[in-house]
Design a protein with these regions (language model features):
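N-terminal assembly/interaction segments in proteins that build large macromolecular machines
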Residues: 1-148
């Protein structure tokens, strides 16, 4: 007998609320897919939304990162390294290192968890999920006045 787990889709919306004039200028939409619907997952979703608001990831992971963004960043890095006067082998290692740093800083799963910087977001997700799986389906971060 095949037992299908009910997949619960949780969507979090968090707006930064500050007193005075900055009320609601930043928002995050986060869609999670998980078989759990408990307070731990709900609290984690809120924390993850705050992570997104604070760190402005460009995508969830490397696979979903826009190839044009990667290409432009690679061109910038190559030009920078070329001007440094290093030999080809060292230049290649520097380029790879800088590109990996860019990817880690701009993809949500590879970012350092703001509340525990020694861990990455993907490690925190594994800890919260336990045996079950939490999947990030979609993230949207918006700021008043920015194009979406």
């Amino acid at each position: 007998m095949l037992l299908l787990k009910k997949i619960i889709r949780l969507i979090f919306l968090i707006c930064t609320l500050q007193l005075k004039k900055n009320i609601g200028k930043l928002g995050v939409l986060l869609s999670l897919e998980t078989p759990k619907n408990n307070s731990e997952v709900l609290n984690f979703g809120k924390q993850l939304a705050m992570q997104i608001a604070a760190s402005s990831p460009l995508s969830i992971d490397k696979d979903t990162l826009d190839k044009n963004i990667l290409k432009k960043e690679m061109e910038i890095i190559e030009e920078e390294v070329k001007n440094s006067g290093k030999n080809k082998e060292i230049s290649q290692r520097i380029t790879e290192s800088k590109l990996n740093k860019f990817i880690n800083e701009n993809t949500l799963l590879n970012q350092e968890w703001i509340m525990e910087p020694k861990k990455k977001v993907k490690d925190i997700i594994k800890n919260v999920a336990g045996k079950d799986k939490i999947k990030i389906k979609k993230i949207v971060r918006y700021k008043v006045g920015e194009a979406i």
